[in-house]
Each structure stands twice: as structure tokens, then as C-alpha cells.
């Protein structure tokens, strides 16, 4: 455990941190994600992303253009894990928060088996909201994520598209986050 380079400006934070990133333009989001992704590549962290395809493909293309020498690292199966929409509902289920915590634990401990690696997990909250959650249910999910990651070498970044998220959901979720960036 220790301090990690966030890959965004000159920010650093402790492992076990959950950061909310608020944005309203995809180009701003890509700049932030490129830095986080590259910092994870440099330190050989496991990177997991639950992003919509509209962000995922441009992110990988922009990374290939900006960091062509490091692109091979992203193609290693244990290095970058991209999960699509169908996995999101089973992973972030407000009806079974204990199972969600267990899935986070198993993902983390799987990354420790051969070569221990820290985890950088990027979650687009819109993927979670497809389950038609109430603001309170979203806040509970964020709270559970915080509990699950606080004792691990895990950086959790939750993305909030201000163009899409209802204000009541945003405020409920942000009450659970200690760190909020506005891009």
C-alpha cells in the first residue's frame, strides 16, 4: 500500500481511494482517462473498465496514437479488462450488495495470484443506472464500493456524465465520495 500517481495533472492519492469524476464533454473525459490508463501501464497495474462502447473505442484509439510504444502492454489479457454492458448488471446489483462486494474481492484476489498487481477500476455510472436505481440505491452501491476497496491496492474511479445523470442521483452518489474532480 502506498501512494500512486493518478496520471492526471500532478495528482497522487492513496490506494483504496474512490474518486468521482464529473464531466460534460467526451473530449475532457478522454484526456483524463488517457492519463490514468497510461499511469497504470507504466506501473503494470491491472486495469478494468466498465465503459460504454462510445468511450471505449475512442479511448483505445487515442492511446494507440499517443503512446504507441506501450500499446503492446494493453493487449495482454491479464492487463486490461474491458467489460461490456451485460456484465454490469450482475456486478453492480443493488438487490445483492454482499454479492457485489464478493465480486470486487474475487476480482482483486485473482489479480494477486501469479504476480501481485494493484487494480485501477474505471466505472461509468451510467452503466449502473441502466438498472433504474433510485438515488438511495445508487448511494448504497457507492458506499459498498468504498467499503470493498478501502483496504486494497485498488483505485476506483467513477465517471459521472453531467449531461445524462439526474441531479438527485448525482447528489446522492457524491455524498458517498470523498474526492470529486470536475473536468
Where are the language model's segments positioned?
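Non-catalytic regulatory/interaction regions at protein termini and inter-domain linkers
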Residues: 1-183
